Amino acid sequence: MIGRIAGTLIEKNPPHLLVDCHGVGYEIDVPMSTFYNLPATGQPVTLLTQLIVREDAHLLYGFGSAAERNTFRELIKITGIGARMALAVLSGMSVSELAQAITLQEAGRLTRVPGIGKKTAERLMLELKGKLGAELGHAPGAAPVHDSAVDILNALLALGYSEKEAATAIKQVPAGTGVSDGIKLALKALSKA
């Protein structure tokens, strides 16, 4: 398994890279989030990688953070989600945005990713439920998910509400609302339900 590549960035043409590592050029596909953070060609680059071995090819995927690579690994475990689709998901949203969409059961955010329809989004939410927040949201290098909606969700769960009830109530809370005000608004929404 090739877990990490360090070398000189020779070519970059989205989403493909060519990295020279002691005279050997590795073709690596990366999500756009990693691509945008790459140095200029001719500069040193280090990427965490995932090698996918298929019957007809050995494909190398690169990531700028452990959180991205871990998310990629979780995504490709899901039936019907291949490496290309996983790369599209990571290109369309950050790890923290994906974790939040899964936690809040927001299929609409997932369907904005090209190639993800309603059924695939629902499968992603079902399969990744409970995995992204615990595993990937706290992984080294992961962007912290400190959005007030997540804090409100955790508070409602601690009060004994189901994830579905809490997620529905949070949708009634305007974006940018503080945690304490958001909890009050969510509780009001739950009392009316």
Curated annotation (Swiss-Prot):
Region annotated Flexible linker, chain positions: 144-151
Chief location of this protein within or outside the cell: cytoplasm
Pfam family, one: HHH_5
Record keywords: Cytoplasm, DNA damage, DNA recombination, DNA repair, DNA-binding
A GO MF label: four-way junction DNA binding
InterPro entries attached to this UniProt entry: DNA_helicase_Holl-junc_RuvA_I, Hlx-hairpin-Hlx_DNA-bd_motif, NA-bd_OB-fold, RuvA, RuvA_2-like, RuvA_C, RuvA_C_sf
Region of interest called Domain II, as start-end residue ranges on this chain: 65-143
Superkingdom, taxonomy of origin: Bacteria
Stretch list, region Domain III: 151-193
CDD domains per the UniProt record, alphabetical: UBA_RuvA_C
Disulfide-bond pairs as recorded: none
Region of interest (Domain I), residue spans: 1-64
Coiled coil: none
Gene Ontology biological process: DNA recombination; DNA repair
One GO location term (cellular component): Holliday junction helicase complex
Compartments (UniProt record): Cytoplasm
Subunit structure: Homotetramer. Forms an RuvA(8)-RuvB(12)-Holliday junction (HJ) complex. HJ DNA is sandwiched between 2 RuvA tetramers; dsDNA enters through RuvA and exits via RuvB. An RuvB hexamer assembles on each DNA strand where it exits the tetramer. Each RuvB hexamer is contacted by two RuvA subunits (via domain III) on 2 adjacent RuvB subunits; this complex drives branch migration. In the full resolvosome a probable DNA-RuvA(4)-RuvB(12)-RuvC(2) complex forms which resolves the HJ.
UniProt record similarity statement: Belongs to the RuvA family.
HAMAP family attached to this UniProt entry: DNA_HJ_migration_RuvA
Function: The RuvA-RuvB-RuvC complex processes Holliday junction (HJ) DNA during genetic recombination and DNA repair, while the RuvA-RuvB complex plays an important role in the rescue of blocked DNA replication forks via replication fork reversal (RFR). RuvA specifically binds to HJ cruciform DNA, conferring on it an open structure. The RuvB hexamer acts as an ATP-dependent pump, pulling dsDNA into and through the RuvAB complex. HJ branch migration allows RuvC to scan DNA until it finds its consensus sequence, where it cleaves and resolves the cruciform DNA.
Entry remark concerning the domains of this protein: Has three domains with a flexible linker between the domains II and III and assumes an 'L' shape. Domain III is highly mobile and contacts RuvB.
Protein name: Holliday junction branch migration complex subunit RuvA
Organism this protein belongs to: Cupriavidus pinatubonensis (strain JMP 134 / LMG 1197)
